[in-house]
């Protein structure tokens, strides 16, 4: 599952919330954007994609909710390799809830809003609420070491996450 469509490539190459990025999109001033967008759905697909990227010298940029607070979605100007945006939003499941130990296992692509709603139905909370919570993903929170409005009660994301499975080159 991938796309080479211009609109998908453009969407995955900038964030949603800064006036600078909105301006650049509206006035066709983005410096560079992804060559392809891959939509991953599992850890196995992620491993295969990273292996292929290494083999063929491709630059991968992860994409979650697209909030881009850290400005990490735009390919670097000096990047000469093929750039692939890796969309994690299809990895958005709640895999398990351990009510006794107050633990939840989720996919990297689940948004804060969806996770909070699912946990609230069981009488729980995520305990993490960055300003971008409605759109941002758990994978994005972890990769950017996000802080949230409830940090004084629950801690930042590094205090909340107990176990992490991560695929790296």
Language model region names:
Residues 1-169:
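Noncatalytic alpha-helical scaffold of FAD-dependent oxidoreductases
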């Amino acid at each position: 599952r991938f796309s080479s469509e211009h609109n998908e490539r453009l969407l995955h190459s900038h964030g949603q919330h800064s006036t600078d990025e909105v301006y650049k999109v509206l006035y066709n001033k983005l410096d560079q954007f992804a060559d392809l967008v891959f939509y991953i759905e599992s850890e196995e697909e992620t491993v295969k994609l990273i292996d292929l990227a290494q083999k063929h010298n491709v630059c991968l940029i992860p994409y979650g909710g697209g909030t881009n607070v850290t400005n990490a979605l735009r390919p670097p100007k000096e990047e000469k390799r093929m750039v692939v945006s890796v969309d994690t939003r299809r990895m958005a499941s709640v895999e398990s809830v351990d009510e006794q130990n107050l633990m939840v296992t989720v996919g990297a692509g689940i948004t804060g809003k969806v996770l909070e709603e699912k946990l609230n139905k069981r009488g729980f909370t995520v305990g993490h609420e960055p300003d971008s919570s409605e759109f941002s993903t758990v994978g994005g929170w972890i990769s950017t070491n996000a802080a949230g409005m409830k940090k004084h009660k629950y801690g930042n994301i590094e205090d909340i996450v107990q176990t992490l499975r991560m695929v790296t080159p």
